[in-house]
């Protein structure tokens, strides 16, 4: 009788077990790396919004900062196709990219975070603003919350699980240390 060549069932089970052990070690590290990348992107987005706000304030002094209900949309282009044919206007300043200007809800998040802008001013000119970012899926896309106001200093809350509607006073509190 000829001896058959190949792997035995035990050998195959051992190989599968080794692969599962390696996956069990690697997958959590991969998820933590993704959360870290999303948080870095969120902090960068806050910085981009701050830069856009300064440019907006300089370009449209009668409006002040873009700090009303459509603040992020005002900083970006009106459509994904780009700026209006006549050039930027205060309702479509084209200072930030389309994806960031639309990242105002969980469904329209940018790199796992969505953003909001609040103001203490009731009407234009808006002389103050606070921008904040929250994870779209807490503990999956991010853990920390981020905020900043017109001073440009970015603050982070180590476990922020709420909508991005942080006020200037909360952003400056001890619960939100500077980055």
Per-region residue spans from a language model:
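N-terminal single-pass transmembrane signal-anchor helix
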Residues: 2-30
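Functionally critical, cavity-lining and gating residues within the transmembrane helices
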Residues: 24, 39, 55
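Aliphatic-rich helix starts adjacent to a transmembrane/signal segment
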Residues: 29-46
């Amino acid at each position: 009788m000829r001896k058959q060549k190949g792997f035995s069932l035990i050998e195959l089970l051992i190989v599968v077990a080794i692969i599962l052990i390696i996956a069990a070690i690697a997958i959590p590290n991969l998820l933590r790396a993704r959360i870290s990348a999303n948080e870095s992107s969120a902090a960068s987005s806050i910085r981009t919004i701050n830069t856009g706000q300064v440019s907006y304030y300089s370009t449209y002094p009668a409006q002040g900062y873009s700090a009303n209900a459509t603040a992020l949309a005002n900083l970006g282009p009106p459509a994904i196709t780009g700026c209006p044919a006549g050039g930027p206007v205060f309702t479509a300043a084209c200072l930030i990219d389309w994806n960031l200007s639309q990242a105002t809800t969980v469904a329209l998040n940018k790199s796992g975070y969505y953003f909001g802008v609040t103001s203490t001013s009731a009407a234009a000119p808006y002389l103050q603003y606070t921008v904040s970012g929250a994870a779209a899926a807490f503990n999956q896309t991010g853990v920390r919350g981020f905020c900043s106001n017109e001073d440009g200093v970015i603050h982070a809350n180590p476990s922020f699980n709420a909508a991005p509607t942080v006020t200037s006073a909360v952003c400056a509190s001890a619960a939100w240390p500077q980055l």
